[in-house]
Each structure stands twice: as C-alpha cells, then as structure tokens.
Design a protein with these regions (language model features):
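Short, charged phosphate-coordinating catalytic segments
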Residues: 172
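Phosphate/dinucleotide-binding and metal-coordinating scaffold of catalytic cores
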Residues: 1-166, 175-230
Length: 230
C-alpha cells in the first residue's frame, strides 16, 4: 500500500477489499511510524502517524494525519538544519513565482526537527516517478519525455533548479501525475528541495550529456522562449 499510487496486493482468495485498507481513510499504527522517524522504541505518546517506506531517499520519513489532512514529515540530517531551511525557502520562492510545488514548513515531532508538507496525491490523482515512467512511455530520452508529457512545468523545473542550486533532481525526484483512469495529466508539482543552494557553476546536468546545469537552463530559455518566465 502507498499514498502515492493506487496499487495494492492481497493474498489469493482473501476477502479483503480496498476500502478495508484504504490509507486515505484508515488509521495507522502510531508506534511503527514513530520508530521509523526517531529510530527509537522508547515512545511516550501515540499519534496518528505512519512510516513512509515507499519513497526513495535516505532521509527518515513518516506520515501524520492532522485535522483530516495527511502530511509527510522528513527528518533533518543536518545539525544546523540547513536542509529544512532550504526546503522552506525554495517553497516560499516558488509560491511567489506561482510555480506548482509542494509547500514545506519547519516542524518538530517527538523531539525530531523535520520539514513538513501536505501530500498532493489523492484517491483519484497519483504520481509515478520519471524513472519508472520511462518503461511506460517507451521514451529513452528523459528530456524529450519531460517535454512531451509535462512541457511547461518540466522546463520551469530545469530553470528553477539551476537558479536555486538544487543538485538532487535525479530521476526519482520528479514525477508525473496520472488519474484513476491511468491517463497522464502532466508533471507533478515540484518537490524535494533539501539539496537546494548546493550547486556549482560547472556542475554537469542530468538532462544534457556533457552540458552544465547553466548551459541546459540557457538552452531551455532560448529554445522554448521562456524569457517571460524570468
């Protein structure tokens, strides 16, 4: 089960139905989730919290339910909390520029400092990573794939990642949205900014062979006439 795609597995002959296990509506095991993010079994309080074990990445993550909404918590791995500061700062910047994105805020949960964002998937709108989408689309060139299935937001992502010095836009860190009819709806809102402000001028781009992030951003602006976006 996952809150990011609609697929689930049950034993053959099982009488369980999806509504019996629907994570959007069912409560979670609080202790399991707290262990996932704190690494400790010495839990003094129970909250409606779940471990997030389906996302890629080394940061400890878990899900909480607050006032009917579901939030993803990601624990900081930096003593100075620069990873949280980066996510919150980029989130505010993208908000000012009206770029679809996950909104991050700083939070503290069970004495663990975290970034916190409300999940953007629903029972009817799901995400698939670019990495997984390659097999589905039959498109081996990820730049062409991004332009084909989510052009506007994909091109903005490349420019914004250069401007914010985000060095972690690997192909499991951006995604496409698809609905409950398996129809692709475009690029998902941008997410995962904890490695922003870490870039260098000569860093090689993940979207352009031997080109740098700067060169690919310039190519996008000039080729697709994105000057108005700036």
């Amino acid at each position: 089960l996952s809150l990011f795609d609609p697929y689930w597995i049950k034993a053959a002959g099982s009488g369980i139905f999806y509504e019996d296990v629907n994570l959007y509506k069912k409560e979670w095991d609080g202790i399991f989730g707290l262990i996932a993010i704190t690494g400790s079994r010495n839990i003094t309080s129970l909250e409606k919290l779940s471990p997030e074990l389906t996302l890629i990445g080394s940061w400890a993550k878990c899900l909480i339910r607050e006032d009917g909404d579901i939030y993803l918590l990601k624990a900081s791995m930096d003593e100075e909390l620069k990873d949280i500061e980066a996510e919150v700062t980029v989130s505010k910047l993208f908000g000012a520029l009206n770029i679809p994105h996950a909104e991050y805020e700083s939070a503290e949960y069970e004495d663990v400092f975290c970034s916190k964002t409300k999940i953007m998937t629903t029972e009817y709108m799901h995400w698939v990573s670019a990495d997984e989408f390659i097999d589905f689309s039959g498109c081996s060139n990820q730049f062409e794939m991004g332009v084909k299935y989510g052009k506007d937001n994909f091109l903005k992502m490349i420019i914004c990642d250069y401007v914010t010095g985000n060095i972690d836009r690997h192909h499991q860190n951006w995604a496409f949205e698809y609905d409950d009819q398996n129809e692709v709806r475009g690029l998902s809102p941008l997410f995962d900014f904890n490695f922003a402000f870490c870039g260098t001028v000569d860093r090689k781009s993940q979207f352009g062979a031997d080109n740098t992030d700067f060169e690919v951003a310039v190519y996008v602006i000039e080729t697709f006439h994105m000057e108005a976006f700036l």
